[in-house]
């Protein structure tokens, strides 16, 4: 296998692939995504002209699909790193093809160099995160791929070149996938907490999270980051949920209540209750605190006299779809070409 490097390979939207993907593939993918019976999957796709997202919503409305929060698929390997300093924090993901490579010294040195280079840039130039990052309410900024590749290692080498060198050394595809950064506001009393799960080395593991808060201790902020890794929230609070996401959830819930025969005012109360339940699942402040489930995260933070500012979580390979290979066919092809 010849080594190569790709920057920020992201999962395409299912709708965009519809014209290029066979009907059997769409059925297979939606079946794996939802766990619904194949008969229902095929019926939903047929009813919606093989629009997989519309079919997915229809299956959810019938209670045949897994919750959106659990629908993500993690396939790719590699490692993530969390690194904080006095004036900022970064989360970084580098992908490899195998866990064996991810545990190797050269790969772990690479991801540490990536995190250190990014943190140096963030702390030396606060504007960098604003000029080269995409803002999302309540989250760290997602840095653009072209800027990450230009950052320099401690010996002056661009990160893109450092990745290429490691790819050549380990003989695998290695890629800088994504980075999130936060530049702390001087004098604002912001506290940064981090947590790394599945540690491969100090600050490097399979999943990591960062929480930025005010008015709490660093120890408590680290506990909040641990909660983020354990509970996988998607948004900081309910007002951070994008309007289109909220409308989509409401539409699914409304479809589920159709034909119930209940008065309109009762239906609206049911919808409000289901939305509140949704917020409890996906919003950090609304979740039950893992260290004390008698209160929400928001109440736990307020009990410490603080408030949440932002958070982000990164899990190795999350959102990347990897082609499933027929092992027997792969071996046969290898024999044929040797």
Swiss-Prot record:
Keywords from the UniProt entry: Elongation factor, Mitochondrion, Protein biosynthesis, Transit peptide
Major subcellular location class: mitochondrion
Bilayer-spanning residue ranges: none
Name the UniProt record assigns to this protein: Elongation factor Ts, mitochondrial
PROSITE patterns: EF_TS_2 (PS01127)
Interval spanned by the transit peptide: 1-42
GO molecular function, one term: translation elongation factor activity
Its biological purpose: Associates with the EF-Tu.GDP complex and induces the exchange of GDP to GTP. It remains bound to the aminoacyl-tRNA.EF-Tu.GTP complex up to the GTP hydrolysis stage on the ribosome.
GO annotation terms (biological process): mitochondrial translational elongation
GO CC terms of this entry: mitochondrion
Family matches, as InterPro entries: EF-Ts_dimer_sf (IPR036402), Transl_elong_EFTs/EF1B (IPR001816), Transl_elong_EFTs/EF1B_dimer (IPR014039), Transl_elong_Ts_CS (IPR018101), UBA-like_sf (IPR009060)
Compartment annotation: Mitochondrion
Family: Belongs to the EF-Ts family.
Pfam family, one: EF_TS
């Amino acid at each position: 296998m010849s080594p190569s490097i790709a920057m920020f390979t992201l999962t395409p939207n299912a709708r965009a692939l519809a014209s290029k993907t066979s009907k059997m593939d769409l059925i297979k993918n939606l079946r794996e995504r939802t766990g619904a019976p194949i008969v229902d999957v095929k019926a939903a796709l047929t009813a919606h002209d093989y629009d997989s997202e519309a079919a997915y919503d229809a299956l959810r409305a019938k209670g045949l699909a897994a919750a959106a929060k659990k629908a993500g698929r993690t396939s790719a390997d590699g490692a993530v790193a969390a690194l904080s300093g006095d004036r900022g924090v970064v989360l970084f993901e580098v992908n490899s093809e195998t866990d064996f490579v991810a545990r190797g010294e050269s790969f772990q040195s690479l991801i540490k160099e990536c995190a250190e280079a990014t943190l140096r840039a963030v702390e030396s130039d606060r504007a960098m995160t604003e000029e080269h990052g995409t803002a999302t309410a309540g989250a760290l900024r997602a840095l653009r791929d072209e800027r990450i590749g230009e950052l320099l290692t401690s010996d002056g080498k661009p990160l893109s070149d450092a990745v290429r060198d490691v790819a050549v050394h380990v003989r695998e595809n290695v890629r800088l996938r994504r980075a999130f950064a936060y530049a702390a506001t001087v004098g604002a009393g912001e506290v940064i907490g981090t947590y790394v799960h599945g540690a491969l080395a100090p600050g490097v593991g399979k999943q990591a999270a960062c929480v930025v808060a005010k008015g709490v201790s660093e120890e408590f902020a680290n506990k909040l980051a641990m909660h983020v890794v354990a509970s996988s929230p998607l948004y900081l609070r309910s007002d951070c949920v994008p309007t289109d996401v909220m409308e989509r959830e409401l539409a699914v819930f409304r479809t589920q209540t159709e034909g119930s025969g209940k008065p309109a005012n009762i239906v609206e109360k049911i919808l409000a209750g289901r939305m509140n339940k949704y917020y409890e699942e996906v919003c950090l402040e609304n979740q039950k605190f893992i260290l004390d489930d008698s209160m929400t995260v928001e109440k736990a933070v307020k009990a410490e006299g603080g408030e949440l500012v932002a958070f982000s979580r990164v899990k190795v390979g999350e959102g990347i779809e990897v082609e499933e290979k027929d092992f027997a066919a792969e071996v046969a092809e290898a024999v044929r070409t040797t």
